[in-house]
Amino acid sequence: MRVTALLLAAGCAVAQPAFALNILLSNDDGYRHPNIRALYSALKADGHTVRIAAPYSDQSARGGAFFFGRETQVGRDDDPAYPDSYYLTTTEKGLCETDSCAGKQVDIRISGTPVMAVLLGLEKVLPHPDLVIVGPNPGNNLGALNSASGTFNAASVAVLSGVPALAVSADLKEQDSPRIAALVTHLVDALDRHRQADGALLPKGVGLNLNLPPLEKLQGARLTRIGRYVPFHALYTEDLGKLDAKLAGKPGIGFAWSPPPDASNAEDEAVWVAKGYLTLSPFNALPGAPADSERLGAALTPLLGQATLTEPKP
């Protein structure tokens, strides 16, 4: 697969030998999710030092939430295949509903959030990493919905802490975790080989929001902007049946399809993912924040032609 000559023409980074990196992984789906485990294994096999600091359980759509002033507990994965995987929990007050303590206030063990997991990782699990990768998320994080994304916001925390970060999301129905991991690992290798003039993996203060289309439809790679467009939007509804048949007639927060994109959305990441492109959208820790697009385009374009489209051989 090839990208356009225009994308391949620009570029200022110089190829360098690849080195083993210290990489912190996190997600918003829990430390046992197949995607993060596959990425851990792929990066380790490529020679990198990799550690996981993730929520205990699914924390999708938690955005930038975190619980402050509460005691936390850190656990370690008991699967010997993932000896460097850690998770975070805390407690919350709630009403007991069992017969033995009905109506009483009790402490309920709950998962830490994605932001909390990255903060833990940067402080205790792998201080001063070369790179933070959050994901791969099962479901794309696109456009305006990034503001609610635990994946995106956790990566933003890393960028704000001075660490280059990738927020990685795949198609919701994509089940090929090893292939997703191989593509991300290949991108990491490209970042390492095409460092910036100062030796950094990415321009200072910049992260990348990476979204993958269904892999069987992958057409190429595209440098995009996060933008505002997203094919669906959140709303309150009196009937959640369209989201889950078991919730028919029940009220709650669901989704509705958005109108088609217009000319103003032409370079938005959601538009290009829908066309079958792997998208790389630079961000500086805030959704839609302005960035020097020309400078970033020149710095990142080599990755599109030389890294993300040619998958590593098995």
Task: Outline where the language-model segments fall.
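Alpha-helix C-terminal capping segments
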Residues: 121-127, 153-164
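Electrostatically charged, flexible surface regions
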Residues: 181-314
